[in-house]
């Protein structure tokens, strides 16, 4: 049976919006636009993603904290460039009860301005560095564009942010490399191939020295940013007076970095791995990795259900998340429900399987079925789950790579966007004026230049298609979410 991805590719927006509700991820009907209710199944998946993030944070020496959601306007105003980047997006708290507040408060859009006044109290000596903390919290941004669950929302409810402070620019750079390694581990855990780009000056995070963004390719040829890393140098340290005493007794400002992700990670998983039947979850994050569907006949119900429960218990003991569907409905309806929810592997057992000590494994990613011996069930299930994960990654990698096109002219770039969208790589002189002109002509956003920067150098002899000067870089453009 062939996997169908017609609606997934041709009418992605409708497919995605329907699936978010029918698969039990979120309910969009909450009476505040852009703020959605997490449903139990969706939250379980997100918690499995976060479990991996927590483990990576622990492995790399980050400590978890939890800051208040309200930030005084006086703290928010300390970093001018940061305010300029966020002032149109913040929610203001102006009253306590009926009384106007002396100092207005904002609901955090991100936590730099909340955290760094405390950093200036906590960091005193070179012995306190490197200082590495993180939190997963709700943040609030007044999005004026069209909202979409998990992708563009006004309450980002699973916002991960790691903040670090260092005694030198070089150590901060080492932290960025560690962030990239953590992100790569997470992306493999989610079977998500991605690209990293260094953002252009006009699109870096407000207050950053430079910003990196991780993008994935969505089914409609648009890109989705699912992670960011920023090196702040000493920009925020000077605004918030975060200094430390050196070994020689001098005082220096710290160097800072941040690393951020959100529930867009789950949006990417749903979008990239799905098909016309619904979600296809990587086994690593599926709340149920294996569903067992008993298919009894009237005279064999007790034996078939007992056999299904026996297999489930053995899989559970082996650490596999398993569920036996004993609902009194037709097997076909059960298949439909679990395929919609993206359960990676289905085991079907009937009277013949009980008699022959066998079971049928049905893969969600390929819809293929194989019959296996009951005695080898744990080994076969593990092997199949690993194969599903690897297949999801390779399929998504091929999709991403097939949607990256290198061109030399604006006309060629336009043709790519008209044909299939995706990512266009084009020579660029490095001047902001030319970059903005290309954004305008292509009706696309410059993602930046490939990172690490040795990948970003333009081949010799290439010209910027706007000004005709020698190209310094290869720049990436895409239509984005």
Curated annotation (Swiss-Prot):
Q: Which SUPFAM superfamilies match?
A: C-terminal domain of ProRS, Class II aaRS ABD-related, Class II aaRS and biotin synthetases
Query: Which reactions are catalysed by this chain?
Result: tRNA(Pro) + L-proline + ATP = L-prolyl-tRNA(Pro) + AMP + diphosphate
What single Pfam family name could you report for this chain, choosing any that match? HGTP_anticodon
- Give the main EC class: ligase
Quote the SMART domains the UniProt record gives: ProRS-C_1
Q: Which Gene3D superfamilies match?
A: Anticodon-binding domain, Bira Bifunctional Protein, Domain 2, C-terminal domain of ProRS
Recorded superkingdom: Archaea
Return one GO MF term.
Answer: ATP binding
- List the GO terms this entry assigns under cellular component, sorted alphabetically: cytoplasm
Sorted UniProt keywords: Aminoacyl-tRNA synthetase, ATP-binding, Cytoplasm, Ligase, Nucleotide-binding, Protein biosynthesis
EC number annotated for this UniProt entry: 6.1.1.15
- Give GO terms for biological process: prolyl-tRNA aminoacylation
Does the UniProt entry include the keyword Ligase? Answer: yes
Q: Where in the cell is it found?
A: Cytoplasm
The record's domain comment reads:
Consists of three domains: the N-terminal catalytic domain, the anticodon-binding domain and the C-terminal extension.
Say what the protein does.
Catalyzes the attachment of proline to tRNA(Pro) in a two-step reaction: proline is first activated by ATP to form Pro-AMP and then transferred to the acceptor end of tRNA(Pro).
Q: How does it assemble?
A: Homodimer.
What family is reported? Belongs to the class-II aminoacyl-tRNA synthetase family. ProS type 3 subfamily.
Put simply, this protein is called Proline--tRNA ligase
């Amino acid at each position: 049976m062939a996997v169908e991805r017609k609606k997934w590719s041709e009418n992605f927006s409708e497919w995605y919006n329907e699936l978010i509700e029918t698969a039990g991820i979120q309910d969009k009907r909450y009476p505040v636009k852009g703020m959605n209710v997490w449903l139990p199944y969706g939250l379980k998946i997100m918690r499995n993603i976060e479990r991996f993030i927590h483990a990576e944070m622990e492995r790399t020496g980050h400590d978890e904290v939890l800051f208040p959601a309200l930030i005084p306007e006086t703290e928010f105003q300390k970093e001018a460039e940061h305010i300029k980047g966020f002032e149109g997006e913040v929610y203001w708290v102006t009253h306590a009860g009926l009384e106007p507040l002396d100092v207005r408060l904002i609901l955090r859009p991100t936590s730099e301005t909340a955290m760094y006044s405390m950093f200036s109290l906590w960091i005193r000596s070179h012995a306190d560095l490197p200082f590495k903390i993180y939190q997963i919290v709700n943040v609030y941004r007044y999005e004026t564009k069209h909202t979409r669950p998990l992708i563009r929302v006004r309450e980002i409810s699973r916002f991960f942010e790691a903040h670090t402070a260092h005694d030198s620019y070089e150590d901060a750079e080492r932290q960025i490399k560690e962030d990239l390694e953590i992100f790569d581990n997470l992306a493999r855990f989610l079977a998500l191939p991605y690209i990293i780009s260094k953002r252009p000056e006009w699109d870096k995070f407000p207050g950053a020295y430079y910003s990196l963004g991780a993008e994935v390719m969505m089914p409609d040829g648009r890109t989705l940013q699912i992670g960011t890393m920023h090196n702040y140098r000493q920009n925020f340290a000077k605004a918030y007076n975060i200094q430390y005493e050196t070994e020689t007794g001098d005082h220096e400002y710290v160097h800072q970095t941040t690393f951020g992700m959100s529930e867009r990670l789950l949006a990417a998983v749903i979008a990239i791995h799905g098909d016309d039947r619904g979600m296809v979850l990587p086994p690593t994050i599926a709340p149920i990795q294996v569903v067992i569907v008993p298919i009894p006949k009237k005279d064999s119900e007790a034996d078939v259900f007992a056999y299904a429960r026996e297999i489930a218990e053995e899989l559970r003991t082996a650490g596999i998340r398993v569920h036996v569907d004993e609902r009194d409905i037709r097997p076909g309806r059960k298949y439909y429900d679990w395929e919609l929810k993206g359960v990676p592997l289905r085991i079907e057992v009937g009277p013949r399987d009980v008699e022959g000590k066998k079971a049928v494994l049905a893969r969600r990613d390929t819809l293929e079925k194989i019959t296996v011996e009951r005695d080898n069930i744990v080994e076969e299930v593990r092997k199949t789950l690993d194969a599903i994960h690897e297949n999801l990654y390779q399929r998504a990698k091929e999709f991403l790579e097939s949607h990256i096109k290198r061109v030399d002219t604006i006309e060629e770039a336009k043709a790519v966007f008209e044909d299939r969208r995706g990512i266009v790589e084009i020579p660029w002189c490095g001047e902001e004026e030319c970059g903005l002109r290309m954004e305008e002509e292509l009706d696309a956003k410059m993602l930046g230049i490939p990172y690490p920067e040795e990948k970003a150098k333009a081949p010799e002899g290439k010209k910027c298609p706007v000004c005709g000067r020698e190209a310094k870089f290869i720049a990436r453009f895409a239509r984005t979410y």
